[in-house]
Amino acid sequence: MRFRLIGALSMGLFLSIVTTAAASVQQVTTPEQQFGHEIGADYELVNYTELYDYFTKLAGESDRMTVQDIGLTEEGRPQVMAVITSPANHADLDRYREISRSLAKADGVAEVEARRLAQEGKAVVWIDGGLHATEVLGAQQLMELVYRMVSRSDPETLRILDEVILLAVQVNPDGMELVSDWYMREADPQQRSTRGLPVLYQKYAGHDNNRDFYMSALAETTNINRVLYREWFPQIVYNHHQTGPSGTVLYAPPFRDPPNHNLDPLILTGLDGIGAALHGRFVSEGKGGATMRSGGSYSTWWNGGLRTTPYFKNMLGLLTETIGNPTPIQIPFRPERQISQGDLPLPVEPGEWHFRQSIEYSQTANWAVLDYAARNRDHLLFNIWRMGMNSIERGNRDTWTVLPFEVDAAATDLGGGRSGTVDDYRRLLQAPENRDPRGFIIPSHQADFSTATKFVNALLKNGVDVHRATMEFAVDDVTYPAGSYVVKGDQAFRPHVMDMFEPQQHPNDFAYPGGPPIPPYDNAGWTLAFQMGVEFDRILDGFEGPFELIEGLAEIPSGVVVGAGAAGYVFDHRDNNAFLALNRLLADRRQVAWLLEPPVGVDLPEGAFYITANQVDRSRLMTLAAETGVDFYAVVAPSGETLRLRRPRVALWDRYGGSMTSGWTRKILEDFEFDFEVVYAEEIAGGDLRSRFDVLILEDGAVPAPNGRGGGGASAGASGVPAEYRDRIGSITADRGVPEILDFARAGGTVIAVGSSARLGYYAGLPLSDHLAENGRSPSRTEYYTPGSVHSLKIEHDSPLTHGLGDRLDVLFNNSPLFDLEPGAETVGVTRLGWFDTDTPLRSGWAWGQERMQGGTALIEAKLGDGELFLFTPRITFRSQSHAAFPLLFNGIFYGSADDEPIF
């Protein structure tokens, strides 16, 4: 009888489990029912409108899923996020989100409490798709993932739903709509292709949308960062990409060296753990072709991508790069990829490959990550707390970050590979003056505090805790005014804080001794505080003060209007927002002067802008001051030399398909309210630019090399291009475009040539030569290599073009040209305005052979006929980050079109 009772109880329990599982399954719409085909069908792509509708429908059909609009895109579309977990978890979602936040921020959470919360909480996993829109797999596999999560009832899926909260996010809606529609526009499936897009697949950045995450300049990035670092704090962030290395199917973590030196070691071991789960699942399912580490170029060095920025918030950022296209492809035969090895456990045979296979590989990867999170839920939750607490503790004591250049110097000091003593270690790697800062203070009395506030907002968007001084205070015998910003190191996101303020030191990384350098994944150095020209103090000891935590974002303090009843008002050229105020005044049809000498009666340097009192009401200035943060000072009429400013007619070069460098410049011009038109190669080659424009901006990549390489036929591919885009086809060449650009300048126009386009100076016949060449030979990469890094320029104040700049300027330099001015250059109107005056110009990153840069000229003003050429070889508009260099662009726009007629 007892056995029967137990058996009956067991049967009842079994029936309960089956009933519960069955009850959790609703009849949901399949992709075939919604779209008429399965996800990944040959020659088919779903667009974003269809994805959005499908997610909305599934959310209405399933109690496992809700959808949220996390913000608008740059083109105004709602950006959708699906939140998927068990119905029971949905009922307590706010509690689980708060647990995730508490453990990630760590502050005030003791270890005992952290362990308890780790047991109570749920793992939060972010999986996205579609960031790089032409990598079409990401967005398509996301729909398959969401469908499977709300429709499957197998034990693994139910366990994942119980233990994990999945955030499934389309991260580039505009791009998905563009690319899918472009592919599907052809009625004949055999003619469909994602190639030949007429515009960037993100309004401003294109592929660079995955380079914006520490700056957060784009709408989509800001939406994503808010969810990741201010709301949900996922332990895992999985970013889908394409394509896999040739001869494989996909690349997955772990990643190659070097790691960033600010990262917690648990990031590296955590990536190894998830990587093992990923590769183990592929092998167990017989899905070959998954490679890792040396199989690709991906590392954990760079900050700034959707995968990499999470590392600096103690989150495990994952990336897969997977082959596949709705048009079937071939896996090529690569003999070296056919032998099993540590970084490629199971090779894949070459042959035809269909998109549906890529969808299945993506789901294997998704389920490996979700299963890992479910099985290791408490470890993930506790470890994010542990990493956060490690950061807090490091920020509260003396610590030293061991950096490559210091290690190299220590090895040289010891000599010949000899081992040293503990005292040597402390002497060479723990000198008191080299310890990590406990925090950073950004004084509010700096001239360009508006840009400093924009820097602080980039930190805040990334979840960093920033304080504001409520009154004057002193640290280390230095007095700081109220309103100064304080960023302390004793916080969970300390790795990001250090990475934004401190220089990066990329190790010397070569294929073999004496061999070529191994290019870093993206930039080698990027210190944002340097790029933005923020003035700050490093504080090496603990400090306190009258500080309040900033909630939300920081507002640029309202400017003031000082004095009245004078001849006019001046405002400071050193404040980048002065150009915003200037453009608004000019849009009001007010006359503004540029003072070439310091104004009388106010402590401002040369370059201040002046407007007469009869040109503007004081109330209008008060409004501008409140809107822009710019201060206006009443002064007597200037007596020195001035330039009259007018709203210039600006042309910005672009190309068919979109230039990312031009796209970023377009955003900068819009942000500062410049009027401009975009022009293309055929319009430039048509001549007569001068009748329509005063200024032409040629961004990096516009001008071909003087040897004739580059450029393209004006009619190439025109037959496949919609009529409204055909006037954009073609490239500037030495024969078509360059002569017309030079004619534009000679006729009185201003040409601003940035980055590689500065070689326009050679075409103009300016007395320039290649500074880096020796005896006509350019150095090899084993002799000289400067991947994207921050370098320090010496600025010469011999022209209004450098007004607003200090004596030194940090610029992003990426194997850019460097010039020598030939003797007598100044007599023909060619002036050096910025150059490398030391043999160690590197500020942040990597520059092999940097001593070769010494003496090289990077900023040039040149007279050409009645007009001017401004040659800026650094990337002065780099990804909307290099605010410190923006005055070069803005000055160039206004200076070239100004005249010397007085306005008073």
Predicted regions located by residue number:
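Divalent-metal coordination cores built from histidine and acidic residues
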Residues: L161-L166, V171-R211
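Bacterial N-terminal signal peptides
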Residues: A8-T20
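N-terminal Rossmann-like NAD(P) cofactor-binding module of classical short-chain dehydrogenase/reductase
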Residues: Y238-N239, I697
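Short, solvent-exposed turn/loop segments enriched in Gly/Ser/Thr/Pro and often Arg
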Residues: A168-N172, Y183, N239-G247, S757
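N-terminal secretory signal peptides that target proteins for export/translocation
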Residues: M1-F3
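Acidic, glycine-rich active-site loops and adjacent beta-strand->loop/helix elements
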Residues: L131-A133, V169-G175, M215, G244
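Feature marks short, surface-exposed loop/turn motifs that line or immediately flank catalytic pockets
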Residues: D174-G175, G244-S246, P326, P704
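Intrinsic-disorder/low-complexity accessory segments
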Residues: S24-V164, A205, R211-D212, A217-A219, ...
